Amino acid sequence: MGTFNNSIQEKIEKLQKTVDTLLHMGENMDCICVDDLSLLNKEIHEQINDLYPCHGKTAEQEAALCLSLLMGYSVSVYANSEDEVKKRAVLRRSQEIMKKRLPSPLKIQLHTIYDKLLS
């Protein structure tokens, strides 16, 4: 079970990095290949599904987990009704975790994406 918890952080960071890669595609005026875009979206969707059933070991890790999941949902083009239900569940988890004491930057990031997805 210990490796599971250690790997959660790695998975959180990987999802955040993949989302960041997608968001910054084409910044250098490079052409964006549709296949690359499709592959990144597929990776994000798979990573979301892998992380969704997980819970953080600490409040801070739970907040980082919710943040990365919500980041993934915000850019995913594979949204379906099941994903919408999962996203709503993560929003509820986020609402609960934001009531706890968290490092300010993490809380601000989580609150920002939470508000964005609710609007």
Feature locations, PLM:
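Intrinsically disordered, low-complexity regions
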Residues: Q9-I12, Q16, H45-I48, K99
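A generic structural signal for ordered secondary structure
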Residues: K87-M98, Q109, I113
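Generic low-complexity, intrinsically disordered sequence content enriched
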Residues: V19, N41-I44, Q95, Y114
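Alpha-helical junction/boundary sensor with strong preference for TPR arrays
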Residues: Q47-L51, H55, S94-P105
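Amphipathic alpha-helical repeat scaffolds of TPR domains
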Residues: N5-C31, G56-V77, S104-S119
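Helix-turn-helix repeat elements of alpha-solenoid scaffolds
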Residues: C33-Q47, N80-R92
